Amino acid sequence: SDGLFSFSVNVNRATANSSDQLLRTGRRTVSTSVRDNAEISVVGELPPQTAKRISDSIKFRAAQ
């Protein structure tokens, strides 16, 4: 939660079936994006545009 919205972020390795998706049911949004061989899902009671901004803001570091 950021104090305004309640949401969860999940990051998994992308598969061949992974694709960008957006689902809005009532106040709940499920936004999935695929980037850098990762599938990023944001789930919560927030606007779709906010879910997209959250997933776009995630940065990956190289493994050490």
Task: Go through the PLM ranges and name each one.
Residues 1, 58-64:
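N-terminal "mature-domain start" segment
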Residues 1-38, 43, 48-53:
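Short, solvent-exposed recognition patches
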